[in-house]
């Protein structure tokens, strides 16, 4: 007698969907899309046109998800050896390397077509360059080659505000580059704080993160210096007349908080401070760009 079919006797479609979704790093992409949206809004003195808004966000999100999936694919060996990442879909065998590559290629191609057709070729090619910068230049080479991997590779991750700007204007602007500078300077202290917390794991898999190659104390000093540089960069939108009083106040408070956390990390020997700095940096960037957005509409 034939055995009745049951959901448990086949791979779960729901679990498979979740595995592919996880490979796109949705939380990272969500924060990135906030910076894209802010770039779009600051580029326009009026309400955003619907077509480049929707197509731009969708296309950029898809290509960012593609880059994240390629990151999962390239890092699958070291991910399986680190406590933070061992449960990812590829190390656990929930997705094969071939399917991960096909998924990343499909997602990236669809995103590129959407951007090229419904926004403009400039944004499509800039987003493609960011994908190559993150997935191939940073993940496949820089990450394993130099302790300055985050600094050099951070440029690709700093591009989203510029992508948002070009999506609605089809041109470069100096104001968009200011936003790129802010994220570029934010990236090293954000990742170095995590690298301090996970130093032993990075050393185990031979990834030359700064705390591994130069020591924790040197890295703490670099984090503090970068937060000071970041605080100065965060004032640039005010100095060039791009933003007003609301942003100035919010930026000053956030920068003070970030510097204070970095100072604590440097001069207080307390367990868990590195992860506190890491988490604070996420809120810092999110709230900073929300302040840019609110200021733009309240003081326009």
Curated annotation (Swiss-Prot):
Pfam families from the UniProt entry: UbiA
Domain of life: Bacteria
Pathway: Porphyrin-containing compound metabolism; heme O biosynthesis; heme O from protoheme: step 1/1
InterPro entries the record matches: Protohaem_IX_farnesylTrfase (IPR006369), UbiA_prenyltransferase (IPR000537), UbiA_prenylTrfase_CS (IPR030470), UbiA_sf (IPR044878)
Keywords, sorted A to Z: Cell inner membrane, Cell membrane, Heme biosynthesis, Membrane, Transferase, Transmembrane, Transmembrane helix
Gene Ontology BP terms: heme O biosynthetic process
Broad class of the protein's primary localization: membrane
EC top class, as a word: transferase
Transmembrane region(s): 28-48, 54-74, 100-120, 122-142, 149-169, 176-196, 222-242, 243-263, 280-300
GO cellular component, one term: plasma membrane
GO molecular function, one term: protoheme IX farnesyltransferase activity
Cell location: Cell inner membrane
rRNA processing keyword on record: no
4Fe-4S is among the record's keywords: no
Enzyme Commission number(s) of this protein: 2.5.1.141
Function: Converts heme B (protoheme IX) to heme O by substitution of the vinyl group on carbon 2 of heme B porphyrin ring with a hydroxyethyl farnesyl side group.
Family label: Belongs to the UbiA prenyltransferase family. Protoheme IX farnesyltransferase subfamily.
Further comment: Carbon 2 of the heme B porphyrin ring is defined according to the Fischer nomenclature.
Name used for this protein in its record: Protoheme IX farnesyltransferase 1
């Amino acid at each position: 007698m034939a055995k009745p079919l049951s959901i448990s006797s086949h791979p779960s479609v729901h679990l498979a969907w979740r595995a592919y979704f996880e490979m796109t790093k949705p939380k990272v992409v969500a924060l990135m899309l906030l910076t894209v949206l802010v770039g779009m809004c600051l580029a326009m003195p009026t309400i955003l046109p619907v077509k480049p808004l929707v197509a731009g966000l969708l296309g950029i999100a898809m290509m960012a998800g593609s880059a994240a999936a390629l990151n999962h694919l390239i890092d699958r060996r070291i991910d399986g050896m680190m406590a933070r990442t061992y449960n990812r879909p590829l190390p656990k065998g929930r997705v094969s390397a071939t399917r991960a590559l096909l998924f990343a290629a499909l997602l990236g191609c669809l995103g590129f077509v959407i951007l090229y057709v419904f926004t403009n070729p400039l944004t499509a090619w800039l987003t493609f360059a960011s994908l190559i910068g993150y997935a191939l230049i940073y993940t496949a080479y820089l990450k394993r080659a130099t302790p300055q991997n985050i600094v050099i590779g951070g440029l690709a991750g700093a591009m989203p505000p510029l992508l948002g700007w070009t999506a609605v204007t089809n041109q470069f602007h100096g104001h968009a580059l200011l936003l790129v500078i802010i994220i570029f300077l934010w990236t090293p202290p954000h990742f170095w704080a995590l690298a301090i917390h996970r130093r032993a794991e990075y050393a185990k898999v031979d990834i030359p993160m700064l705390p591994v190659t130069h020591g924790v104390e040197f890295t703490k000093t670099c984090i503090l210096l970068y937060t000071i540089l970041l605080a100065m960069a965060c004032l640039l939108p005010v100095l060039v007349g791009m933003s007003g009083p609301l942003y100035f106040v919010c930026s000053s408070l956030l920068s003070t908080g970030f510097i204070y956390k970095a100072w604590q990390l440097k001069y207080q020997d307390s367990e868990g401070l590195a992860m506190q700095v890491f988490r604070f940096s996420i809120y810092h960037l999110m709230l900073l760009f929300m302040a840019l957005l609110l200021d733009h509409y309240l003081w326009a």
